[in-house]
Amino acid sequence: MRDETPEQPALLRSGYTTGSCATVTSLAAARLLLSGIASDVAEIVLPKGQHVPMKLVFCRLLNDGKDGAEAGTIKDAGDDPDVTHGAIVFARVRLADAPGVRFHAGPGVGTVTRAGLTLAVGEPAINPVPRQMMTAHLTDLAAEYGYAGGFEVAIGVENGEALAQKTMNPRLGIVGGLSILGTTGIVRPFSCSAYIASIHQGIDVARANGYRHIAACTGNASEDAMRAYYQLPDIALIEMGDFAGAVLKHLKRAPVDKLSMCGGFGKLSKLAAGHLDLHSRNSSIDLRQLAQWCASHAASNATLQAAIVGANTSQEALAMALKEGVPLGDIVCARARDVAREIVPASVEVEMFAIDRQGNIVGEAR
């Protein structure tokens, strides 16, 4: 997850997806094989029609062309930081007798080993839109040169296997490296679309592998709490980060039997107030709201409520309430559960768990 930045520039720079990088490098390598021309720059057309020139860091024959050709470009994510920013994405292309394009996982690109994704088990983790982009460009290239054969395309990412450990790929059953992603070809700054897509994939993989109880967690401590509480395997633990809404809305289309949500007390207080994006950039902890919720409990009093309004942090407010016998953690969890119930199908059993900074459960509601 990203740290909050106090000031955002007025205009943020977009970047390009790994799918765009794979397309431009496969096109350049194939063009070298068909024309003998090694390019420094190649232009592709994105799914929405934009023409984009991209620089190449290499474009060369392999073994004088006997082993095909390869081209590489540096992944530029713009002002949207991700694990692949600055990595070299490359394509190795061979000509084939049979028409069409066949895809392979090169070094640093993973292979699908679990059901539930948009790709079949055993396929390279090159998502559908990047496949469509590469196929369209290579088909046009073949027509341009009067070439009737096909292409064998292996996509790789420098250091991709190590980078993949920083993603959800291992949990999704994508082994050996990264996924080649993208739907528009462009990375929008702070759109978080890739992260949200991985949340959806995590739910789909859990369902496809027979897990009807999932736990959506805001971070490592909440995951550890749910793993210990329910002995759930990693495949049933969904790392939602701040995107509670991404989980709840996806369950409308892909429901499970039971959803356990677990997060820090402060983050769950935001969900309880109706916020579905829990990042501090987009929602704030409301101490006055916490004080009002306390007021509904018999053990509460005006002194406690005033102290909560003046608290430095939500954790301090929680400690004050608990000291006075007010189960503020349970109150917040009950309200967060009710918000979630309004979104997911009625058939989904929802429960909430709040933890403190040490990972201890300080509130729950079923």
From Swiss-Prot:
Q: Which UniProt keywords apply?
A: Cobalamin biosynthesis, Methyltransferase, S-adenosyl-L-methionine, Transferase
Q: Which SUPFAM superfamilies match?
A: CbiD-like
What protein name does the entry list?
A: Cobalt-precorrin-5B C(1)-methyltransferase
Give the catalytic activity. Co-precorrin-5B + S-adenosyl-L-methionine = Co-precorrin-6A + S-adenosyl-L-homocysteine
Annotated organism of origin: Paraburkholderia phymatum (strain DSM 17167 / CIP 108236 / LMG 21445 / STM815) (Burkholderia phymatum)
Gene Ontology MF annotations: cobalt-precorrin-5B C1-methyltransferase activity
NCBIfam families referenced in this protein's UniProt entry, alphabetically: cbiD (TIGR00312), PRK00075.1-1 (NF000849)
Domain of life here?
Answer: Bacteria
- One record GO biological process: methylation
Source organism phylogeny: Bacteria, Pseudomonadati, Pseudomonadota, Betaproteobacteria, Burkholderiales
Gene3D superfamilies assigned: CbiD-like
HAMAP family from the UniProt entry: CbiD
Q: What is its EC number?
A: 2.1.1.195
Task: Check the record and name the Pfam families matching this protein.
Answer: CbiD (PF01888)
